[in-house]
């Protein structure tokens, strides 16, 4: 159980690897859904590859069903944007926009058109992040 709990935490935190700066480290339900979408099948794989550690067939069947249900519900949650209203939308979009800035700044782009596009992306995403943060402060 500790292994699974730590794995979920690590997967959630890893979702933030793509943010441009720590100012966009904003917890949100969409990243949690994505962590669950990764965690559930990995938990199944772990149980399948370590069968000697999981010797209770009834418990194993229950866990497989639980992990499958978590995968299904988290997948539906992210696709349907369950529990995402104004605040969660903004909290999800800020790290998303931050990732676009990071990619534009760090990618080895050589094409002049793509470089120009990245300049526009950086400017627009920074402006939109500032706007979203301001809206969040008012709500």
Label the predicted regions.
Residues 1-139:
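Alpha-helical membrane segments of multi-pass proteins
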């Amino acid at each position: 159980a500790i292994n699974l709990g730590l794995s979920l935490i690590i997967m959630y935190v890893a979702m933030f690897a793509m943010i441009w700066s720590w100012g966009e480290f904003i917890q949100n339900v969409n990243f949690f859904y994505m962590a669950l979408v990764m965690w559930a099948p990995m938990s199944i794989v772990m149980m399948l590859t370590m069968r000697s550690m999981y010797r209770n067939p009834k418990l194993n069947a229950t866990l497989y069903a639980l992990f499958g249900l978590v995968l299904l519900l988290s997948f539906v949650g992210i696709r349907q944007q369950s529990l995402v209203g104004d605040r969660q939308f903004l909290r999800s979009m800020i790290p998303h926009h931050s990732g676009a800035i990071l990619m534009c700044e760090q990618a080895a782009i050589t094409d002049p058109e793509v470089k120009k596009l990245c300049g526009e992306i950086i400017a627009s995403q920074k402006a939109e992040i500032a706007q979203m943060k301001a809206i969040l402060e008012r709500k």
